[in-house]
Amino acid sequence: MASQPQIKSSDKKTAQVSIPPHSTEAEQAVLGGIMLSNQHWDGIAERVIADDFYTFQHRLIFTEMEHLMRNQSPIDLITLDQALRSRGVSDEVGGFAYLAELSNNTPNAINILAYADIVREKAILRELISVGNRIAENSYSPKGQDIKLILDEAEREVFAIAEKRTTSSEGPQNVINVLESTIEKIDILSKLENHSGVTGVTTGFTDLDKKTAGLQPSDLIIVAARPSMGKTTFAMNLCENAAMASEKPVLVFSLEMPAEQIMMRMIASLARVDQTKIRTGQNLDEIEWNKIASVVGMFKQKNNLFIDDSSGLTPTDVRSRARRVYRENGGLSMIMVDYLQLMRAPAFSDNRTLEIAEISRSLKALAKELQVPVVALSQLNRTLEQRGDKRPVNSDLRESGSIEQDADLIMFIYRDEVYNDNSEDKGVAEIIIGKQRNGPIGRVRLKFNGQFSRFDNLAEQREYRDDY
């Protein structure tokens, strides 16, 4: 007797994956459960969006449910059927009969959130398949793209899917939803007791926080100064203050200074011990050693500071490493880059202006993607040295066009004593806000304690005009 042809296991696998992952039963249970119990809506809306439903008719039904909830209308068999009829899509979803079937086949809504999780998980699998296909296509036909760019795009797309496990409402939003969340945030802030007005990450400097309301999520913040003004010191102080005030990590990319030197500066700053003594290890007395030990213990207890001192980093390197720390630690409070001009973008290496533009653009995109403030240090042009008033302005930023455009906040550091030996403002630094997208420009004065590698609040402030 002739043997039957055998089906290869690979053919079976192909047949199994030809239909994208989905669960019709789970989708039906979610929709039927909502009709039975509207009180579960908020939990459902946090887990799934209309596009998570594989079946087209289910997407239409869920979309109409969203409209009804937005209008504070109950969702039941009658109201949903009438709403679908008024939009002319009742026949497309199967009419009243199909809605009744959904309702009748769902005995209760006890497990509705578990069903919603199934719908979302299947949607994520479909997204992974789609992304995987695009990655494969780009790999087969790279079209001259650098391998790092292909890897970065692949990582970005997969990372975006992972993020959607907690935020499934990306894409265009109706302004009604945005208004509700905005008013809710304003209401929460208005009810806080002893609220300082800081809505972002505190800078640690009272008057600077008053001007900026802190360093805001998704903002690109540029800190610029001529050499010897304390640019890196100020940046590290921002990192220290953010790390001490927040539980989420601070990530520092130090392209100029080794990690040990960064830590020496931070220890000197927080312990208020002369940084020369720390750097040389000489003449430290018992009190100073105790201060150092206390700061070390504080860092170990917080355990929320990461330093990457790799040199020559590209935007791809910074993005991938930031995403990893973000993912492994459940978020970030701030990212610091010291400094922008030491980064490189190989694809634009023939044109420095375009290279800086790409670096600046990528840092802004990273801030928006991770919803954290990204602080980047920048150099200033030497031409300001030729002016009588050497206080920096936005046009003094080296390769300034793209940096000025991408930045949400630009801060310059100016210390008059660097230029004038007889300055009346010895030990005083001006933080000049040259641009603030959502706030005023102006100046803030801080105390500069160079021996401790730190800036401090200035007890007595002189009045400065904010017309700078």
From Swiss-Prot:
Region (Disordered): 1-22
Recorded coiled-coil stretches: none
Domain SF4 helicase: 194-462
GO annotation, cellular component aspect: cytosol; primosome complex
BP terms from Gene Ontology: DNA replication; DNA replication, synthesis of primer
EC code(s) of this entry: 5.6.2.3
A matching Pfam family: DnaB_C
InterPro entries, alphabetized: AAA+_ATPase (IPR003593), DNA_heli_DnaB-like_N_sf (IPR036185), DNA_helicase_DnaB (IPR007692), DNA_helicase_DnaB-like_C (IPR007694), DNA_helicase_DnaB-like_N (IPR007693), DNA_helicase_N/primase_C (IPR016136), P-loop_NTPase (IPR027417)
Protein name: Replicative DNA helicase DnaB
Subunit structure: Homohexamer.
Keyword terms of this UniProt record: ATP-binding, DNA replication, DNA-binding, Helicase, Hydrolase, Isomerase, Nucleotide-binding, Primosome
NCBIfam families associated with the record: DnaB (TIGR00665), PRK05748.1 (NF004384), PRK06904.1 (NF005369)
Described purpose of this protein according to its UniProt entry: The main replicative DNA helicase, it participates in initiation and elongation during chromosome replication. Travels ahead of the DNA replisome, separating dsDNA into templates for DNA synthesis. A processive ATP-dependent 5'-3' DNA helicase it has DNA-dependent ATPase activity.
GO molecular function terms listed in the Swiss-Prot or TrEMBL record: ATP binding; ATP hydrolysis activity; DNA binding; DNA helicase activity
Reaction(s) catalysed (UniProt annotation): Couples ATP hydrolysis with the unwinding of duplex DNA at the replication fork by translocating in the 5'-3' direction. This creates two antiparallel DNA single strands (ssDNA). The leading ssDNA polymer is the template for DNA polymerase III holoenzyme which synthesizes a continuous strand; ATP + H2O = ADP + phosphate + H(+)
Family: Belongs to the helicase family. DnaB subfamily.
Keyword Isomerase among UniProt keywords: yes
Gene that encodes the chain: dnaB
Binding-site list for ATP: 225-232
